Structures are given as C-alpha cells and as structure tokens.
C-alpha cells in the first residue's frame, strides 16, 4: 500500500478523534477512507479523486463546496485538511460548520510548511478555545468543540468579480478562494492572450485545457466580438472544483458559447477541436508537479484536428518544448521572456 500524505497519516494516528459520523474536507488520497473507523462524508476539490469517491458505496462524496442539502448538520466530527490558500481556509471552515451538528468536534490538520500556525488563528475565531492534540510527521492536529453551526451555506456568497483588460479586450472574471490567480491576470496568461491578439487562431472552436476561472474563453469571446469576427465556441475543462464553478459563472456573465466540465486530464474528454490552448498548472499543493501537463501533451494530439494548432504558455524553465515536438510536431516560440514562453505547434495533416 502506497504511503499516504502526511496529513492523512496523522489523522489515522488520531483516529480516536473520529467520533460518530465524520466529514473529511480536503481529501487528497482515496485510500485513506477504508482505513477510517467509520464512513461519512468525503469532500475533495480534485475531479479525478471525485470520480473515485462517486463510486464508493460507503462514503458520501462531495465535489468541492457544493454539498447536498441533506448533508447539513449531519456530522459529529468534521476534519479540515489545511488548504494552500489562506482565504480558502475560511471557506473550508464555513463548510465544516455547515456540515457539523451542534456540538460537533472540529479538527484541523496541516503541515507546518503549509502555514498551520496562521490557520489556527482563523480556527479559533469560529471554534472558540482550540487545543493542539498532536504534532507528528511535520504536521499539527488541533481540535475545537465550541463551534457554532451554520444553517446556510451558499458558494455564491463567496464569489467575487474582477474586471480585467488585455490587448484592448475587457472582461469580468469570477473568483473563489483557492482559484489560480485570484483577483488578477497572471503574467503567463497575459502573454498568451497577447499572442492571440497578434496571431489569431482563425478557428470557430477552441478547447481550453486547465481553463481556471475561464479567463481565456471569456477573452476570446470578447476579442471576436470587438473585431467583428465570426462567433467562437470555447469548451474548457479543469481539475479543480472552484475553477469549474468560476469558469461557468464567467461564461454565463459574458455570454460565452461553450461547455465547462470537470476532468482530470483528457481521459474522459470526447471529440476533437481545430485548436487547443492552455496555461497548464505545474503545482500540486505547494510542490512542483509537471506530470499533469506531460500527460496532457502525450494525449492532446488525439483531440486536435489534423492541421490543428496547440498553443501553450509555460514557465520558461519547464521542459515542454521537446515533448511538444515529440507528440505534436515542429515547435515555434511566439513570445518569450525570462519567466514565460508561448509555444505553438500544428498537428500534421493526414496524407
């Protein structure tokens, strides 16, 4: 059996805290669940893990921060695994209060390098007196028992909007705690959009892999409208629950034509497009992880029409150029600086 993340190992070390029906918020490894003493609710933001949880007959799954109404006030113990973003900790604690019964125990587990010390200040605001019950595997475990439950929890109450502009195109982007580049346009995406203005795709359908909050699709929609070009459809996918929610909201507000769906990579994606575009992630939590993009590059040709274009922005130090050349074809650098590079490649036409 493969090793669990440190936070999950520490929970099992303190399994005595799981009294009654538990809720585990922020599960990152499904193999934790059968090792817990009793089943309950398991929440994950990761689409691939959600697919695994959805087939579990014992645990009730929750994809991100949209619980079923009947899950409100149903848990005796709620465990919060510390998220990367401080603002998301507040969101996760609010969900914990919604799921917990009156008098439920609230447990927070996090690694020291992930900022557990700062999170405890947030924890004490909602749980009153909190006590550290363990410290192991570079993690701390804190528990509070005076948490006031929430009778209402609406993800839309946490939604924010940011007005952005790039290459003469204005757009509104939805945001939630934990979403990439919340409240701003990251420099890599800006460079990518600028190349789209200078060297348009010239197609009517695009697939946006790792679409985040829907920035690229919203921008393409606005760019085509502003230039009087043909309408464009931009479908997108992302692995994170908040990103999928925000992208759908961004598309709805802008009137973008396209479908946003949750997926871990391309395995469940059907069809192909004349252009695929991406600003892919290279972090899992606080760790560098390029495996998702490497897998994407190995599979994306099957979703590109013959002669179709892949356009991708990435940090310049990441080793993607050779992979693009291997799986798609000759590579061109449309823009580059010390930090980012925009690559373009075309799938070879058949015959």
Curated annotation (Swiss-Prot):
GO function terms (MF aspect): 16S rRNA (guanine(1207)-N(2))-methyltransferase activity
Enzyme Commission number: 2.1.1.172
Pfam family, one: MTS_N
Keywords: Cytoplasm, Methyltransferase, rRNA processing, S-adenosyl-L-methionine, Transferase
The organism's place on the tree of life at top rank: Bacteria
Enzyme's top EC category: transferase
InterPro entries for this protein: Mtase_sm_N (IPR013675), rRNA_ssu_MeTfrase_C (IPR023543), RsmC/RlmG (IPR046977), SAM-dependent_MTases_sf (IPR029063), Small_mtfrase_dom (IPR007848)
Family indicated by similarity: Belongs to the methyltransferase superfamily. RsmC family.
Subunit structure, interactors included: Monomer.
Record function comment: Specifically methylates the guanine in position 1207 of 16S rRNA in the 30S particle.
Name this polypeptide is given: Ribosomal RNA small subunit methyltransferase C
Species this protein is from: Marinobacter nauticus (strain ATCC 700491 / DSM 11845 / VT8) (Marinobacter aquaeolei)
